[in-house]
Amino acid sequence: MSVEFIGMIGTREASELHDPTVSLTGGSIDLAYVRKFAKVHEDGGFDRVLVGYSSTGPDGFNVVSYVAAATERLKFLLAHRPGFVAPTLAARKLATLDHFSNGRIAVHIITGGSDAEQQRDGDWLDHDTRYRRTDEYLDIVRRVWTSEEPFDYEGEFYQLKQAFSEVKPLQQPHVPIYFGGASGAAVDVGAKHSNVYAFWGEPIAAIKQRIAEVKAAAPPGKDLRFSVSLRPILGETEAKAWEKAHYILSRINESRVKAGIQLSAGASFRPQAVGSSRLLDFAKEREIHDKRLWTPIAAATGARGNTTALVGTPEQVAESLSLFCHSRQRKSRNQGELGK
């Protein structure tokens, strides 16, 4: 069983500890910070880093191209939202970047769980319709990557005549596809197209159930791998790790008070994204699941992304990660500035 550790880089220093109004995947660009952040991951032995996506942030293709030139071994997971460039163009862009990065990229497909996010870029399709579009989009992208002859395509969202790309991915049979999404519509599309299905950090029993659901929806015989996003909060002793965790939470709450944001998502708050909603439900059930899966940061921030943590000594957190791996996962992901 292989295990891959994935970090995350942004384009400027940002943290919920200091300013809860800034996005970890958006904002301005600090070139020196980007280079340093990437090198820290490479020198620290991370296998890959996620370059995130938001409707107000820098373009991930350019970020990956820049960081690939500043590193040698580190691989990249480029978040990409279908629907805003043609799938034929996306396929060529990714294949080109695969060559210029010497085969170090993968693409993370995020269809989008927030109508407001989508509408900033002019997308007014509803949630399930967006996933039907993603299905067509990935059909076309994969075919462009692998087809040796021009092809036509007639779908609900895309109609193509003699589509073809002279540039094919360096990686064969194509650039690895990661996929995120917790809804039923997401599972059907992701199980069909992805090489790696990504989850946020939920209790082990829930992860086992979700793995079973994705595998059941996948084509017969497909070899799927799985990723879990968690924030490691480490200490020399377990007591020091929990002290650090509560300090981090207090800093987040203080920064939210200063920004005029309520401390907790509250019972009436319900995000559109199904994954975020699930994390809030687990946080409402209890603060700690499976001995050290800690949920209060998810509750305090509205579960905007990877917001659950594993708390303990390095050895204890490693033991907890091994339990996720033994949930028949092939891939484990650790992300989050708060865990460093």
Can you name each region flagged by the protein language model?
Residues V51-G60, G83-T88, E202-K208, L234, ...:
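Acidic-and-aromatic substrate-binding clefts and catalytic sites of carbohydrate-active enzymes
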Residues P87-T96, V187, G235-A245:
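Catalytic cores of alpha/beta
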Residues A38-D43, S65-R73, L94, D98-I105, ...:
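Acidic (Asp/Glu)-rich catalytic clusters
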